[in-house]
């Protein structure tokens, strides 16, 4: 099964290894990517710099409402599935 993500708005929750890889892959396939991570530490700061240098929009240290302006979410494996933002995204029919 394939899914064309070109021109889709994709939010990625988590800015560790898998989030960075997902952001790069989605961007290379023509998606409009936004990455958000609540945690702000050395790793997320480094990854933030790497992605923004490649014109991928990111935020760290908070989740703004921009995360909900999306067609599709990719949730990193380390992010708990029962947090409020995920429940809100589901209620908005974000896949």
Question: Where do the protein language model's features map onto the residues?
Answer:
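N-terminal leader/targeting and accessory segments in enzymes
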Residues: 1-95
């Amino acid at each position: 099964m394939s899914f064309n993500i070109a021109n889709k708005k994709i939010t990625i929750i988590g800015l560790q290894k898998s989030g960075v890889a997902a952001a790069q892959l989605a961007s290379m396939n023509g998606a409009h990517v936004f990455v958000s991570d609540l945690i702000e530490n050395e790793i997320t700061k480094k990854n933030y710099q790497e992605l923004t240098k490649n014109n991928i929009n990111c935020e760290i240290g908070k989740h703004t409402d921009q995360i909900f302006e999306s067609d599709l979410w990719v949730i990193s494996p380390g992010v708990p599935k029962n947090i409020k933002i995920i429940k809100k995204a589901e209620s908005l029919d974000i896949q």
